[in-house]
Amino acid sequence: MEESKTKRKEDRIDLKNTPPQKKSKRDSTNDETARTSLRSIMPRGYKMMENMGYKEGETLGSNESALKEPIKVEINTKRRGIRAEKPDPSTMNDMQMSEQRFIKRESEMKNNKRLKKIWYRIQKVAFEMMGDSDLYNPGEDPRDFNVLWRSYVMQLNEEVAKNDLNNHSNNDNEDKNNMIPMVNESLEASPAIKGEKFGRPSTLIDCDTSIIGSRITKDTELAELEELSIEKRITKLNIFLRSEKYYCFFCGIKYKDEGDLYEHCPGVNEDDHK
């Protein structure tokens, strides 16, 4: 017991006699650099500045409101990085909002592409089930068909026109390749017809202007349909197929009659079939 008491007394005496802790080398160097003048920090640079007309205490340059000393370099003594502090909450909110808008826009674009594919497919089904595929002739006026799948007929006409152009260009290339090169002597004009100019014969193409005029005029019925959203157009055409052919596009089944349709089909919309 006595030995432990004596040890405690000795420890207390040592704590009293211990000198205060010294500052670290980094802190001492920072204090020294803060106290020292510009002349001692950069002697060569200071001499160059004196030669250029600088005097200690005066401004740098001719402007009176200019700096009197160069910008001091603040030494970062923290262990964190330069931008490792907590971000501003206002900027974080803006970043989150922009990210949410981007995700929403991407999902809307994907859904719109998916609905366009469904709209094309249901138009094709109606075009074939109603027998218009047997009556259709390439280049026919789309207004002769039902407005619910009229845009599908227009796409068919565009595809036929593109194929015709491609075939025509391929035939022209084949004709050019098969042409026999003429001898230069045969290209020389005879003395009797030298000096005469021959114009290229103009070709007249007969066309029915009534058909062109009918196609140029605006299709108001189709414009009214396209004002509706794609979901409403799909629903409208599906209702038409259900009433006319007892067929549900989302079921993919042609029912026997109206009773069989309403008994087994869950609904008109796509969401009803999920």
Swiss-Prot record:
GO CC entries: cytoplasm; kinetochore; nucleus
A GO MF label: nucleic acid binding
Cross-referenced Pfam families: DUF4187, G-patch
Bias type Basic and acidic residues, positions: 1-15
Domain of life, source organism: Eukaryota
Record bears the keyword Cytoplasm: yes
Main location: cytoplasm
G-patch domain: residues covered: 41-87
Annotated region (Disordered), positions in chain: 1-40
TM region(s), chain numbering: none
Subcellular locations according to the entry: Cytoplasm; Nucleus
Keywords linked to the UniProt accession: Cytoplasm, Nucleus
Protein name: Uncharacterized protein YLR271W
More info: Present with 1470 molecules/cell in log phase SD medium.
